[in-house]
Regions:
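Membrane-interface extramembranous regions
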Residues: 2-134
Length: 134
């Protein structure tokens, strides 16, 4: 039994990437930052939806379900959408612009990587070859 396959590492990477949306929630805000209000609530809801979506996509990947890619792309889109209220909530709540910008940059790069792997036809075929074989 081989444990360190590209499929397994990709699944773990997908799950871990999804879990980083926790960084955008109020519980990860710097001490003293105001974390109440609609923008933080919207950030929390969208971030948790992205986390659940990435978790479901990971299960689909390991189960070799054809829908896992669509779920991963949808979760990435929801995660990208979560950055909008996060940016305003963080900067208006007292978070440093550097912290907000760093979190946004990391997540934009993750979304770019996921969508590139799953939407560029040559890369998507390679991913499918790694994930779907018997």
């Amino acid at each position: 039994m081989v444990m360190f396959t590209i499929r397994n590492m990709g699944g773990v990477a997908l799950f871990l990437a999804g879990s980083t949306w926790l960084w955008l929630t109020p519980m990860f805000a710097t001490k003293g930052v105001t974390t109440s209000g609609f923008l933080w609530s919207a950030t929390r809801a969208l971030s948790l939806l992205a986390i659940v979506g990435f978790s479901v996509a990971t299960v689909g990947l390991f189960a070799r379900q054809p829908w896992w890619e669509t779920t991963a792309i949808g979760s990435a889109a929801v995660g990208l959408l979560a950055l909008v209220p996060y940016w305003f909530a963080g900067t208006q709540g007292g978070e440093t612009t550097g912290t907000v910008a760093w979190n946004a940059l990391v997540h934009v790069l993750m979304v770019a990587g996921i969508t590139t792997l799953l939407l560029v036809p040559q890369l998507e075929r390679w991913v499918q070859h790694q994930v779907m074989p018997g």
